[in-house]
């Protein structure tokens, strides 16, 4: 079988047989794939370090009939320390759950991979997890084609909106004339902040700051909209609310 080299971050792990794991890995070349890490649970396995969630590695893999399997692997960067802090474990788990939910298997999306790596790095360096989460929510909507229309009214295309509303049904802004009963009013400051996040390069995400009140206002839009897009609840958020 031909050996293939790729880089990727481990999203999830499932124990397989007595000493192996099935890993869900987001790779740069093949998107989200499942990979067999054979005998990685043995005490002296050379694959054990690269067979845990939050590990960004270079993998040498081969494609068998039904699944990829790891031939060798080396760690590029470890985000494992995030799992050792309860709050950071939840926030990093939230980002990973979003990635896993938005991407189908073998759906290549290098932007999402870079977004995840940058966001985990920001968490690792101590940036406010709530700010990182809002940035991530907006960016992943952009990179997966579900971004909200925030530059004009989704119905009449008017751009000079002085009083803005948000339509979950239509996925964007509505003006005062076009708004419907269930549309919620949002401040222009919120609209501007979201557009700044959209326009900011991934390498400059660390420069974005959001006051707590502004962050919460953005959350009232992004969380329900993501739930509507995915048509399911994000499970880890329920646990987060429980421990708070």
UniProtKB/Swiss-Prot annotation:
Family annotation (InterPro entries): ARFGAP/RecO, DNA_rep/recomb_RecO_N, NA-bd_OB-fold, RecO, RecO_C
Pfam families the record matches: RecO_C, RecO_N
SUPFAM superfamilies: ArfGap/RecO-like zinc finger (SSF57863), Nucleic acid-binding proteins (SSF50249)
GO CC, alphabetical: bacterial nucleoid
Entry keyword set: DNA damage, DNA recombination, DNA repair
Gene Ontology terms: biological process: DNA recombination; double-strand break repair
Lineage top rank: taxon: Bacteria
Function: Involved in DNA repair and RecF pathway recombination.
Similarity-based family: Belongs to the RecO family.
Protein name as it appears in the record: DNA repair protein RecO
Species this chain originates from: Caldicellulosiruptor bescii (strain ATCC BAA-1888 / DSM 6725 / KCTC 15123 / Z-1320) (Anaerocellum thermophilum)
